Amino acid sequence: MVTELVAQRRDLANLLGVEPSDEPIHVFLFEKPADYRQYMLNKHPDFPARRALFVKTDTQLKIYASWHPRVGEDLRHEVTHGYLHSAVSDIPLWMDEGLAEFFETGRGKRGSHGAHIHLLKTRLKQGKWSPDIHRLETLDQAETMTQLDYAESWLWVHFLLFNPQVRDQHLIQAHLIQLRKHGSAFGIADAIDEKFDSIESVLIEHLKSL
């Protein structure tokens, strides 16, 4: 598992064009989930109740998690946050979480996330969801995000990285590089509006192809 997490650093750099810093990421892995929950309740009572958490302080990057059947997924997700935040500040929440959902699937899977695909296709068929990246860009608190928000954030990331109609624009890569250089960057939603018409229908076709 450790080898995979270390290799993920290079995978992220190669895909996104940003090099994480050499700042260490401290992982606190509890043997029992109950011990983890109690520790987080005592030390970080204001944090949301999650199976694992990434915490960035002024001096350290920390991950808290516990052993359980999906610990690998959790660590890949949180380590992605660590690598991203060591390289770039002020990443939009939807992109931060979408990339973490992308990389949590493991190496060699090109970010394919079966649970998100199923959820989005089901809600689309029921008429209970339609994509809206402008709405995602307004999200600024992870604890308010729903599972559908995570799924849609993942889909936009996967779409922008791999769909042949948009991938050559390198929008995510350009956004992150601009953030790193200048501390601020163009909005992805506005850039999409300028370059494409009816991009939501293209996104839905991308989803249906997965």
Where are these regions (language model features)?
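Acidic/His/Gly-enriched intrinsically disordered linker/tail segments
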Residues: M40-S66, A87-L210
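Helical anchoring/docking segments at protein termini
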Residues: V2-A7, P20-D22, V55-W67, H81
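Hydrophobic (often cysteine-bearing) scaffold residues that line and stabilize catalytic clefts
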Residues: M1-E4, G72, R76, P92, ...
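Zn2+-dependent metallopeptidase catalytic core
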Residues: M1-F28, R76
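A short linear-motif detector with a strong N-terminal bias
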Residues: E4-Q8, E31-P33, L41-K43, V79-G82
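Solvent-exposed coil/turn segments that connect beta secondary-structure elements
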Residues: F30-A34, H68, V79, A87, ...
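Acidic helix-start/capping segments at beta-turn-to-alpha-helix junctions
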Residues: V18-Q38, G98-E104
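Active-site recognition of the HExxH zinc-binding catalytic motif
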Residues: V27, E73-S86, E97-E101, V157
